[in-house]
Swiss-Prot record:
It comes from the Bacteria. It comes from Streptococcus pneumoniae (strain ATCC 700669 / Spain 23F-1). This is Ribosomal protein L11 methyltransferase. One of its GO terms (biological process) is methylation. It catalyses: L-lysyl-[protein] + 3 S-adenosyl-L-methionine = N(6),N(6),N(6)-trimethyl-L-lysyl-[protein] + 3 S-adenosyl-L-homocysteine + 3 H(+).
Length: 316
């Protein structure tokens, strides 16, 4: 019987996407995330009661490798790559461990982490293998979280989805920068956007986004391509959304201002609290006005508007 290997990495929460992507690049056949924030809180806005779970600063990223892969080499390579990034991001005290699994354990083990999750008033994310019957008005996003880039339940993604629900009214052109799983593009389509153009520098992300989009019917209005932020893009948009690290966000703000239409919006997420002032100042220097600021735990997200009428914006 073929066996699989489980490699667990304990890392600070802000390192989730970075570590997940590195593990996939190093040959992982799937990743799963254990995060106490997914369960913390007594009652959410939909009246769902969550169990009492102590909130932790760290999460566990679990990657799965076939027994043909030498995970000691993977571990060494991962350690070396992460060591190069310690000045860029505080990943905490990294802990890495491995376990052997039988084939039948691998087939179902990682799926136990994922259940349908109501994210906003309208949007529910459902694992691709789950039969789920939507209620009236509920919009379903099918994702395959085994492909990488998480499940769409990370705080930065949740706030991005709330922001899209806030600004989209139907008929808009949306640019999704750093699309990852494609979840924000799929949500934009479900919320009525006319055309969505999704970009990612990572070829794996481009493939994963396309595969997730194909899990959802009626997504022909989403166009996925490789791209470095908004460089070379000449498409005017009503909404630009980017859920990526703050140090990268500041490099797309000028292009975003160039491309977003008057009265259009720039949504940014993935901003740890220590970087919020930097991002806000960069956006305001470019000419944007802050309309909405959201905080969940240590994460910030925001909606900026390109407008001459500042009566409805923060500080206007």
């Amino acid at each position: 019987m073929e066996t699989w290997q489980e490699l667990k990495v304990t890392v600070k929460r802000e390192g989730e996407e970075l570590v997940s992507n590195l593990l996939i690049e190093l040959g992982a056949q799937g990743v799963a995330i254990e995060d106490s924030l997914d369960y913390v809180g007594n009652v959410d806005r939909f009246g769902e009661i969550f169990p009492e779970v102590e909130q932790q600063e760290e999460i566990v990223v679990t990657a799965y490798y076939p027994d043909t892969v030498d995970v000691t080499v993977v571990e060494a390579d991962l350690q070396a790559r992460l060591a190069e990034l310690t000045d860029f991001m505080d990943l905490g005290e990294l802990k890495i461990g491995t376990t052997a699994l039988a084939e039948e354990d691998w087939a179902d083990n990682w799926k136990k982490y994922y259940e349908p999750a109501r994210i906003t008033h309208d949007l529910t994310i459902v694992p691709s293998w789950t039969d789920y019957e939507a209620t009236a008005g509920e919009k379903i996003i099918k994702l395959d979280p085994g492909m990488a880039f998480g499940t769409g339940t990370h705080p930065t993604t949740k706030m991005s989805l709330f922001a899209l629900e806030q600004v989209l009214r139907g008929g808009e052109t949306v640019l999704d920068v750093g699309t990852g799983s494609g979840v924000l593009s799929i949500a934009s389509s479900l919320l009525g956007a006319k055309e969505i153009f999704a970009y990612d520098l990572d070829d794996v992300a481009v493939r994963v986004a396309q595969e997730n989009i194909e899990l959802n019917p009626g997504m022909e209005n989403i166009h996925v391509a490789a791209g470095d932020l908004l460089k070379g893009v000449e498409i005017e948009a009503d909404v630009i959304v980017a859920n990526i690290l703050a140090d990268i966000l500041i490099h797309l703000i000028d292009d975003a201002y160039r491309l977003v239409k008057d009265e259009g919006y720039l949504i940014m997420s993935g901003i740890i609290k220590d970087k919020w002032d930097m991002v806000r100042e960069s956006a305001e220097s470019a000419g944007f006005f802050l309309e909405t600021h959201m905080i969940q735990g240590e994460w910030n997200a925001c909606v900026f508007k390109k407008t001459k009428d500042i009566s409805g914006v923060i500080g206007g």
